[in-house]
Design a protein with these regions (language model features):
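Beta-strand elements within well-structured catalytic alpha/beta cores of enzymes
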Residues: 3-20, 34, 58, 99, ...
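Active-site rim elements
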Residues: 81-86, 193, 252-256, 320-329
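His/Asp/Glu-rich, glycine-adjacent segments
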Residues: 62-246, 349
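Non-catalytic, well-ordered alpha-helical segments in soluble enzyme domains
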Residues: 32-33, 95-102, 267, 275, ...
Length: 372
């Protein structure tokens, strides 16, 4: 298998239940094309359903006991505090480390957790890059370690989108009856602005790099669907008992709008990389979207995970993948192994995932190594 470029795209919480409805309605044409000409399937998640742990398992092909990322926070024993999880706590090499070691150029955008950005042969923009820490775009700083290499920091800083920069034109596609919103200080409107600006910022950075840097693999992570679902899924049709009429009238289409926006970003990305690039689109888990939607959540830090479904998505599209097929029995551990296989590299025998042989157009030669 001749190595071709690869794009890996993560949509946190994306779910076929919603996607298939939108494809049928003609609202996600790019993903519809990928499904028609590629391979689709479910990805089983892991327990507990905590995104930093899950995306690290995706990036390493290993369970948390091997890679060391167990949740959103970790103890700092010397300082006697609990701190946000960081990339320095990962105990196993991720695919970007392996590919760099093997002479491949890799770009990684917003992977969770990837702060501080790691030195790789390419560009890494950490998961803190898009977060607006202060009101006002002019006062928006950027912490050291957000971008590697450091000399690109000012460039990437300049192409971010702050929530306060969004206009009615940007927000109206996500709203019904927007005239009923009483104030710009509406908390749900502010939440939507932040989620949308975050996604647009990651897209801005990744498309700049696709166009202006040399790369063999580009990995792009978006958490906007997950955040939109946590904020607005209860307001999606069909209307749940107890949902206020005024909120339903305004925000019932917000989740679907966020999916449509992701399809637009996907279309732009695929047009930039061309038909000879292998593309893998995944999510770490799904999200309850029907009568199973909980109206209340456990009062604990990980309580929102109760809204998740156990299966995420996978769609593989490109010259090395089958066409119009459905694959079965895959999990989020089964992403790094096929990435390595696409580049003709061996899979670590200490990896817990498999190389997704059923997804390939031609059965690849799978090599192994004791560990990376």
């Amino acid at each position: 298998m001749k190595a071709k470029k690869v794009v890996l795209i993560g949509w946190d919480a994306a779910d076929w239940k919603v996607i298939d409805q939108l494809i049928e309605q003609g609202h996600m044409p790019m993903l519809a094309e990928m499904v028609k000409k590629g391979v689709r399937g479910n990805l089983s998640t892991l327990e507990p359903v905590l995104s930093p742990m899950l995306w690290t398992s995706i990036a390493t092909g290993k369970y948390a006991d091997k890679h060391g990322i167990h949740g959103f926070t970790e103890p700092d024993y010397e300082a006697g505090i609990v701190r946000p999880i960081s990339s320095t706590s990962r105990k196993s090499r991720a695919f970007w480390n392996i590919l760099t070691n093997q002479g491949k150029k890799v770009n990684v955008f917003s992977w969770w957790p990837s702060n501080p950005a790691e030195p790789i042969d390419g560009i890494m923009v950490s998961n803190l890059y898009q977060r607006a820490s202060k009101p006002g775009a002019k006062n928006w700083g950027m912490n050291p370690g957000t971008v590697y290499p450091q000399e690109l920091s000012e460039l990437f800083k300049s192409i971010r989108i702050h929530p306060e920069e969004l206009t009615e034109e940007h927000l109206l596609p996500f709203l019904n009856n927007a005239h009923k919103i009483e104030s710009k200080e509406d908390k749900k409107l502010q939440a939507l602005s932040k989620i949308l600006a975050d996604a647009a910022t990651v897209h801005s950075a990744s498309t700049w790099a696709l166009e202006n840097s040399d790369w063999d693999l580009t990995a792009i992570y978006h958490d906007a669907i997950d955040h939109a679902c946590h904020a607005f899924m209860k307001l999606r049709a069909p209307k749940l008992p107890g949902v206020p009429d005024d909120l339903f009238e305004i925000y019932s289409d917000t989740v679907d709008g966020m999916y449509r926006f992701h399809d637009m970003m996907l279309e732009r990305t695929l047009k930039m990389v061309g038909p000879d690039t292998n593309v893998i689109l995944i999510s770490d888990h799904g999200f309850q979207s029907d009568h199973m939607r909980p109206l209340s959540l456990p009062k604990e830090p990980a309580g929102p995970a109760a809204e998740h479904r156990k299966h995420g998505i996978i769609c593989c599209y490109g010259p090395d993948f089958n066409e119009g097929q459905t694959i079965y029995g895959s999990s989020i551990l089964d992403i790094t192994p096929p990435l390595l296989t696409l580049f003709g590299l061996p899979i670590g025998e200490d990896m817990d995932g498999t190389p997704l042989i059923q997804a390939f157009r031609e059965t690849p030669t799978v090599k192994t190594i004791s560990s990376w």
